Each structure stands twice: as C-alpha cells, then as structure tokens.
C-alpha cells in the first residue's frame, strides 16, 4: 500500500510539473513572443510500449522493485503526455563546435570538432564516433583526399546535423536515449581513431584520432559533462573499433581531471573485425583489397597509432593485434556492449567476397557460413552483445535499429537491460534483471536467416527480396544445402522463412 501511494505521489507531482511547463509555454506564446516554430509529428501510440522516462526528476526504483514493469508503463505514458509540451521548444539539430585546442586537427590540418545537442537536466551523455574506413600510406591517402575529402577535412562540414537511430531526439525512434546529451564526432583522421601524430613538413597528413576524442571530452566538461552520471562512448564501423581502443583512456582522462563519479561505458557497433585469412589473397595495394592484418600493420606505423596500455603489454611488439575485437576486448576494464552483424559486409569486402548480384560459388558459400561460425565463437564469452544473422554493416544510426530482433528482443530493449544490469551491479546486486537478456546471438547459419533482418533489394531491379529469394538470387542450392544439413528441402525452406 505504501509503495502504491509513493508511486501515485511521484506521478502526481510529475503531472503537475507537466501542467506548469505547458502552461508557461502557452502563456509565453499567447503574450506574442516568438512565432511558433513548425514541429515534427508527435510519436505514435506505439511509443507507449517502448519508451522510457526522462531524467527531469529523480526516481527511487528500489521502492517498487516487485512491480517495476507496471510502474514503468505508467511513467512511459507520462513521458508520452509530456512530449507534446517539450516538442514545441525542442531543438532537434546538433550544432557544430570546433576544438578549443586548435593544434589537434583533421588529416589536412583543418580544425577538428564535434556536433552537440544539449539536453538540459539530463545527466546522460552519448558520444558517437563516426566510421569510414581508413588510409595507410601516402598514395591511398592522396586518393582518399580526392574522392572522400569530408573524411579528411572539416572545410565543408555543415553547421548542423540531425541525429538518426540512437542519436535521434524522437522517442519513437530512440526509446531509451532520446533525451540524452548527444555528441557526434565526425571522422576526419583516417586512422581508426588511433593516431597521435601531427601534420609536419615531413608528414603530409595529421593522424590524431585518439587526441581528437580526448580534446572533445575536455571541451564538453564546460558544457555540462562535468555533472554527468553516465558517458556512453559509441561508434560504428571504424568508430566501433575506435570505441574498443579508447573507452578506457576516456575514463582514465576523466579520473585524472577529478571527475571520478562519471560512469564510462562503451558501445561498439560493426567494429568487431576478424584477422582471418582472405577468401582470395591479393596484393596490398589499396584499402579494399588489402588483408586486415596487413592494413593495420602498415597503418599503425603510418598513423603513430596508440593502443590501450593493457593490450599493448599483452601484445608488445605486435600492437596491431589490439585493433581486433576478440583480442583487445579481454583487456578492457570498462563495460562494453558489442553490436555485430554475423555476416558483416565490410568484413566480407576485406576478405574479397564481393556480393554484386552474381551467383556465389560453392566455395564462397562455405566461406560465408564459416565467417558466421567464427564470429559466433569469438563472441561467446562476451557478456553483453547483440548479433543478428544478417548481411549488413552498421546498425545503431539506422532508422530500422528498433525493428531487428534476436530471440524476440530488440537492440534498444537489450541496451536498456544492460543499463539496468549495470545499475544493479553498482548496488551489489549480482543477479541480472529477470526477463531482461543482454547476451543475444542468432544460431541460424545463413545470411538473413533472421526474418527481422533489414530489407535486401535486388541491385538490378531495386525490388525487395525475402530471404529465400535472396539466397536463390545468389545461387543458393536448396537441395544441396539440405543434403549437407541432413534434412528435407521443404524443412530447410521452412527454417529459412521462420528464421529458426
């Protein structure tokens, strides 16, 4: 009875706060203030099943531990009712800021920077590292500068940027992090966020990825990060690898500056690469065809690359190993959540498997299946991870990031469960929340055997394909594959259709 009364009191005061905020906003508009700004469509009712409270007021969840789901449903509905008020004054765009330390630059010497959307009252910060491959010698860096200058220079960066997926400010697109402070760091160092060498007369390009991250964190301290409770360092592709390389150093930097109460965590998306043998070995002449190990061996010298100290000690003299997730992960001290497609397109590209619409040879099929198996094996001891059996690359900034599921759980739900499990751990509660999985990996063995995978389109016609059409299109032999698996072809087709 006391708990129910407490919940109702919290909701009562929150509603009163909402009415005051709405009333004040309406009064300002009635008095003839600024012209009302056009605003985006409000979130659908579906958000009520997926949203989460903002951080405008503090809640003691331990008081309703036994009835948490019911309590959260009420608070989610409250957040939905609050949203129309806040939407009228919400600024969705992140704004460009250049680093105060102008000696830390992009490849071409232009100033590095970041995009920021502040969320007043929130003590959660999401710092995102952009991806975009790399270059590892003067020749392919020159080529990259001619064809992809945005990834090496800030000279034409726009003044604002709108976040998508997990960087979105819309609760229907980003149910658990929409009200966080959002930071997007553009990738302009071409060094997998590892470099620490400036541009000089001898060096045509600066490689300062690791320094850019540190300078952004320093600059953000004066913009509210000093009061943060949680800092989530996230990234996709090269940015995902950058998370693995930098999450501990970010935490150590904050501790050195006296901010010991900020919990630093990592979220690595599509950055868990394997140093496996290529399907077809080629000379290391460009970024795409060069074997992953050879790229990093050459790149780490060219960039003046820095790796985490514990990993450096584990692989002294062979520090290139630290760029591969399954090798660096055991040395990382901070909690990191891994998001990885089991059939990652970038991994297949560097392994010289090019799915361009031509029928895939039998040897390529075996290689692709083995890749999924290898990835599963490297992820089996990772406690917090989400690995769908899909053919894709990058995830958390896609607009479909809430739709893909593994074993009935979406990525936003898994991340929320992870967040809760870390909170419980900090309270010395060793057991994870019931019905809240954080170790999610598909077991089906083919690309796109999960029916919730992103849509595949025929490259020649643009038409959508289901998984069976896709596999047939790529030369998949149902009879032969069923025979290899020791099952009836119709049963195999049923499994592919259901994703089992």
Curated annotation (Swiss-Prot):
| Catalytic activity entry | [Wnt protein]-O-(9Z)-hexadecenoyl-L-serine + H2O = [Wnt protein]-L-serine + (9Z)-hexadecenoate + H(+)
Q: What name goes with this protein?
A: Palmitoleoyl-protein carboxylesterase notum1a
Task: Give the family, as the similarity comment puts it.
Answer: Belongs to the pectinacetylesterase family. Notum subfamily.
Which GO terms of the cellular component aspect does the record hold? extracellular region
For whether the record's keyword set contains Signal, the answer is yes
- Which InterPro entries does the record associate with it? PAE/NOTUM
User: GO molecular function terms here?
Assistant: glycosylphosphatidylinositol phospholipase D activity; palmitoleyl hydrolase activity
What keywords are assigned to this protein? Glycoprotein, Hydrolase, Secreted, Serine esterase, Signal, Wnt signaling pathway
Q: Where is the active site?
A: 237 (charge relay system), 344 (charge relay system), 393 (charge relay system)
Q: What gene is this protein a product of?
A: notum1a
Is the keyword Transport in the record?
no
Signal peptide start-end: 1-26
Question: Where found?
Answer: Secreted
What processes does the entry annotate via GO biological process terms? anterior/posterior pattern specification; negative regulation of canonical Wnt signaling pathway; negative regulation of Wnt signaling pathway; neural tube patterning; protein depalmitoleylation; Wnt signaling pathway
For this protein, what is the EC number? 3.1.1.98
Glycan attachment points? 101
Q: What does this protein do?
A: Carboxylesterase that acts as a key negative regulator of the Wnt signaling pathway. Acts by specifically mediating depalmitoleoylation of WNT proteins. Serine palmitoleoylation of WNT proteins is required for efficient binding to frizzled receptors.
* PANTHER family given in the database record: NOTUM-RELATED, PALMITOLEOYL-PROTEIN CARBOXYLESTERASE NOTUM
Q: Which organism is it from?
A: Danio rerio (Zebrafish)
Q: Per UniProt, what is one Pfam family of this protein?
A: PAE
